[in-house]
Amino acid sequence: MRRISLFITAIFSLSYSVIAFADKYEFSFAPNIEQDPVMMEAIFLEKRILNKQEISVYQTKYENNIEGSWIKTPVTPFSTKLNAEILEQFDLYAVPFEKMILVPKNWQLLNGGVGVNGSISYVFTPKTGKGYLSYYHAGACVGCAMISASAFFPEAQKDAKEHDFEAYTATVPPLSQVRLKPHLMAYQVNKGKDKLDGVAYYNLENDGPFWKAEVFLPESQQKLATPLLNQFIREGKQ
Protein backbone atom coordinates (compact mmCIF):
# COMPACT_ATOMS: atom_id res chain seq x y z
CA MET A 1 0.00 0.00 0.00
CA ARG A 2 1.40 3.39 -0.98
CA ARG A 3 1.15 5.83 1.87
CA ILE A 4 0.91 9.53 1.13
CA SER A 5 1.94 11.23 4.35
CA LEU A 6 1.26 14.73 5.51
CA PHE A 7 -1.39 15.39 2.87
CA ILE A 8 -3.48 17.12 5.51
CA THR A 9 -0.71 19.67 6.05
CA ALA A 10 -0.83 20.47 2.36
CA ILE A 11 -4.50 21.36 2.65
CA PHE A 12 -3.78 23.97 5.30
CA SER A 13 -1.92 26.06 2.74
CA LEU A 14 -4.97 26.39 0.51
CA SER A 15 -7.39 29.26 0.80
CA TYR A 16 -11.12 28.66 0.61
CA SER A 17 -12.79 29.47 -2.69
CA VAL A 18 -16.57 29.44 -2.86
CA ILE A 19 -17.82 27.83 -6.05
CA ALA A 20 -20.77 29.44 -7.84
CA PHE A 21 -23.99 28.07 -6.40
CA ALA A 22 -26.11 25.48 -8.15
CA ASP A 23 -26.85 22.29 -6.22
CA LYS A 24 -24.97 22.19 -2.92
CA TYR A 25 -23.42 19.11 -1.33
CA GLU A 26 -23.85 19.38 2.43
CA PHE A 27 -21.17 17.92 4.67
CA SER A 28 -22.39 16.45 7.92
CA PHE A 29 -20.50 16.44 11.20
CA ALA A 30 -22.82 13.68 12.41
CA PRO A 31 -22.88 10.06 11.14
CA ASN A 32 -24.85 10.03 7.89
CA ILE A 33 -26.27 6.51 7.72
CA GLU A 34 -29.56 4.82 8.59
CA GLN A 35 -29.31 2.70 11.74
CA ASP A 36 -32.47 0.69 11.06
CA PRO A 37 -32.59 -1.89 9.65
CA VAL A 38 -29.20 -3.24 10.67
CA MET A 39 -27.41 -4.36 7.50
CA MET A 40 -23.91 -4.87 8.89
CA GLU A 41 -22.65 -6.03 12.29
CA ALA A 42 -19.26 -6.60 13.94
CA ILE A 43 -18.14 -9.17 16.50
CA PHE A 44 -14.90 -9.46 18.45
CA LEU A 45 -12.77 -12.27 17.04
CA GLU A 46 -9.31 -12.34 18.60
CA LYS A 47 -6.28 -10.49 19.91
CA ARG A 48 -3.35 -10.19 17.52
CA ILE A 49 0.23 -8.98 17.97
CA LEU A 50 1.11 -6.37 15.39
CA ASN A 51 4.53 -4.69 15.46
CA LYS A 52 4.91 -5.75 19.11
CA GLN A 53 1.53 -4.24 20.02
CA GLU A 54 -1.53 -6.28 21.00
CA ILE A 55 -4.55 -5.23 18.98
CA SER A 56 -8.19 -6.36 18.99
CA VAL A 57 -9.50 -7.89 15.76
CA TYR A 58 -13.17 -7.74 14.76
CA GLN A 59 -15.02 -9.52 11.97
CA THR A 60 -17.98 -7.92 10.22
CA LYS A 61 -20.89 -9.61 8.53
CA TYR A 62 -23.39 -8.06 6.15
CA GLU A 63 -26.80 -8.93 4.77
CA ASN A 64 -26.96 -10.43 1.28
CA ASN A 65 -29.67 -8.37 -0.42
CA ILE A 66 -30.41 -11.08 -2.97
CA GLU A 67 -30.66 -14.18 -0.81
CA GLY A 68 -31.48 -12.57 2.53
CA SER A 69 -28.65 -14.45 4.26
CA TRP A 70 -25.66 -12.97 6.09
CA ILE A 71 -22.10 -13.12 4.74
CA LYS A 72 -19.06 -13.07 7.02
CA THR A 73 -16.11 -11.03 5.82
CA PRO A 74 -12.83 -12.98 5.55
CA VAL A 75 -10.18 -12.10 8.12
CA THR A 76 -6.97 -11.76 6.12
CA PRO A 77 -3.30 -11.07 6.95
CA PHE A 78 -2.50 -7.44 7.73
CA SER A 79 0.77 -5.55 7.96
CA THR A 80 1.64 -1.91 8.56
CA LYS A 81 4.66 0.27 9.19
CA LEU A 82 2.91 2.06 12.06
CA ASN A 83 4.76 1.67 15.35
CA ALA A 84 3.37 0.25 18.59
CA GLU A 85 2.76 3.69 20.09
CA ILE A 86 0.37 4.53 17.25
CA LEU A 87 -1.15 1.05 16.95
CA GLU A 88 -2.22 0.97 20.59
CA GLN A 89 -4.82 3.60 19.63
CA PHE A 90 -6.53 1.34 17.08
CA ASP A 91 -8.63 -1.79 16.66
CA LEU A 92 -8.52 -3.85 13.46
CA TYR A 93 -11.67 -4.72 11.47
CA ALA A 94 -12.28 -7.09 8.57
CA VAL A 95 -14.66 -5.33 6.16
CA PRO A 96 -15.99 -6.16 2.65
CA PHE A 97 -14.32 -7.18 0.36
CA GLU A 98 -11.30 -8.95 1.92
CA LYS A 99 -10.00 -5.72 3.39
CA MET A 100 -8.62 -5.05 6.86
CA ILE A 101 -8.83 -1.50 8.24
CA LEU A 102 -7.73 0.26 11.39
CA VAL A 103 -10.44 2.00 13.42
CA PRO A 104 -9.96 4.17 16.52
CA LYS A 105 -9.84 1.98 19.62
CA ASN A 106 -13.17 1.21 21.30
CA TRP A 107 -15.20 2.72 18.48
CA GLN A 108 -18.17 0.74 17.18
CA LEU A 109 -19.62 -0.16 13.80
CA LEU A 110 -22.80 1.91 13.55
CA ASN A 111 -24.09 0.30 10.35
CA GLY A 112 -23.14 -0.45 6.77
CA GLY A 113 -24.15 -2.43 3.74
CA VAL A 114 -23.23 -3.99 0.41
CA GLY A 115 -25.44 -3.34 -2.62
CA VAL A 116 -26.24 -5.69 -5.49
CA ASN A 117 -24.17 -3.41 -7.76
CA GLY A 118 -21.10 -3.87 -5.56
CA SER A 119 -21.50 -0.59 -3.71
CA ILE A 120 -20.20 -0.54 -0.13
CA SER A 121 -20.75 1.79 2.79
CA TYR A 122 -19.98 1.68 6.49
CA VAL A 123 -19.68 4.08 9.41
CA PHE A 124 -17.81 3.73 12.71
CA THR A 125 -18.41 6.03 15.69
CA PRO A 126 -17.19 6.39 19.27
CA LYS A 127 -19.51 4.87 21.87
CA THR A 128 -19.87 8.30 23.47
CA GLY A 129 -19.15 11.77 22.16
CA LYS A 130 -18.83 13.00 18.60
CA GLY A 131 -16.82 11.73 15.64
CA TYR A 132 -17.01 9.18 12.85
CA LEU A 133 -15.06 7.25 10.23
CA SER A 134 -16.99 6.55 7.03
CA TYR A 135 -16.34 4.85 3.71
CA TYR A 136 -18.45 4.76 0.54
CA HIS A 137 -17.72 2.97 -2.74
CA ALA A 138 -20.11 3.43 -5.67
CA GLY A 139 -19.45 -0.05 -7.04
CA ALA A 140 -20.54 -0.49 -10.66
CA CYS A 141 -23.06 2.38 -10.53
CA VAL A 142 -21.51 4.89 -12.94
CA GLY A 143 -24.29 7.43 -12.43
CA CYS A 144 -23.83 7.25 -8.66
CA ALA A 145 -20.10 7.76 -9.16
CA MET A 146 -20.48 10.85 -11.34
CA ILE A 147 -23.03 12.50 -9.05
CA SER A 148 -21.11 11.79 -5.84
CA ALA A 149 -17.74 12.74 -7.32
CA SER A 150 -19.05 16.05 -8.69
CA ALA A 151 -18.73 17.53 -5.19
CA PHE A 152 -14.95 17.05 -5.39
CA PHE A 153 -13.86 16.78 -9.04
CA PRO A 154 -14.56 19.37 -11.78
CA GLU A 155 -14.28 16.61 -14.38
CA ALA A 156 -17.07 14.69 -12.62
CA GLN A 157 -19.30 17.77 -12.84
CA LYS A 158 -18.67 17.81 -16.59
CA ASP A 159 -19.26 14.06 -16.95
CA ALA A 160 -22.51 14.20 -14.97
CA LYS A 161 -23.92 17.05 -17.05
CA GLU A 162 -22.93 15.36 -20.32
CA HIS A 163 -24.85 12.24 -19.24
CA ASP A 164 -27.89 14.21 -18.00
CA PHE A 165 -27.23 13.55 -14.31
CA GLU A 166 -27.48 16.14 -11.56
CA ALA A 167 -24.15 17.58 -10.43
CA TYR A 168 -22.97 19.34 -7.29
CA THR A 169 -21.21 22.61 -8.00
CA ALA A 170 -20.82 23.87 -4.42
CA THR A 171 -20.42 22.50 -0.92
CA VAL A 172 -21.69 23.57 2.50
CA PRO A 173 -19.49 24.41 4.31
CA PRO A 174 -17.03 25.24 1.50
CA LEU A 175 -14.11 22.84 1.30
CA SER A 176 -10.39 23.24 0.77
CA GLN A 177 -8.77 20.55 -1.32
CA VAL A 178 -5.57 19.43 -2.99
CA ARG A 179 -5.16 16.95 -5.83
CA LEU A 180 -2.69 14.32 -4.68
CA LYS A 181 -2.69 12.40 -7.97
CA PRO A 182 -4.65 12.67 -11.24
CA HIS A 183 -7.61 10.77 -9.82
CA LEU A 184 -7.14 11.31 -6.09
CA MET A 185 -8.26 14.33 -4.06
CA ALA A 186 -7.69 15.19 -0.40
CA TYR A 187 -10.09 17.63 1.20
CA GLN A 188 -10.88 19.32 4.49
CA VAL A 189 -13.99 21.03 5.84
CA ASN A 190 -14.10 23.22 8.95
CA LYS A 191 -17.10 24.21 11.04
CA GLY A 192 -16.11 26.21 14.09
CA LYS A 193 -13.62 24.07 16.00
CA ASP A 194 -14.73 20.89 14.21
CA LYS A 195 -12.60 19.57 11.36
CA LEU A 196 -13.50 16.89 8.82
CA ASP A 197 -10.79 15.33 6.62
CA GLY A 198 -11.31 13.10 3.62
CA VAL A 199 -9.90 11.51 0.48
CA ALA A 200 -11.86 10.85 -2.70
CA TYR A 201 -11.06 8.90 -5.87
CA TYR A 202 -12.71 9.29 -9.29
CA ASN A 203 -11.87 7.61 -12.59
CA LEU A 204 -14.57 6.50 -15.03
CA GLU A 205 -12.09 4.19 -16.76
CA ASN A 206 -11.71 2.13 -13.58
CA ASP A 207 -14.07 -0.71 -12.65
CA GLY A 208 -14.64 1.09 -9.34
CA PRO A 209 -15.07 4.67 -10.57
CA PHE A 210 -15.63 6.45 -7.24
CA TRP A 211 -14.93 6.03 -3.54
CA LYS A 212 -14.42 8.33 -0.61
CA ALA A 213 -13.31 8.00 3.00
CA GLU A 214 -13.97 10.63 5.66
CA VAL A 215 -12.99 11.06 9.27
CA PHE A 216 -14.23 13.51 11.88
CA LEU A 217 -12.24 13.17 15.09
CA PRO A 218 -12.40 14.73 18.54
CA GLU A 219 -9.60 17.26 19.03
CA SER A 220 -7.66 14.83 21.23
CA GLN A 221 -7.51 12.26 18.39
CA GLN A 222 -6.95 14.46 15.35
CA LYS A 223 -3.40 13.16 14.89
CA LEU A 224 -4.99 9.84 13.84
CA ALA A 225 -6.55 11.36 10.72
CA THR A 226 -3.53 10.77 8.49
CA PRO A 227 -3.02 7.03 9.23
CA LEU A 228 -6.78 6.45 9.07
CA LEU A 229 -7.12 7.99 5.61
CA ASN A 230 -3.82 6.76 4.20
CA GLN A 231 -4.97 3.16 4.57
CA PHE A 232 -7.63 3.73 1.90
CA ILE A 233 -5.07 4.96 -0.63
CA ARG A 234 -4.06 1.91 -2.63
CA GLU A 235 -1.17 1.37 -5.02
CA GLY A 236 -2.18 1.65 -8.66
CA LYS A 237 -5.63 3.11 -7.96
CA GLN A 238 -4.86 6.79 -8.35
Curated annotation (Swiss-Prot):
Key words, A-Z: Signal
Signal sequence region: 1-22
Highest taxon, organism lineage: Bacteria
Pfam family, one: DUF4850
InterPro entries reported for this sequence: DUF4850 (IPR032322)
Protein name: Uncharacterized protein PM0291
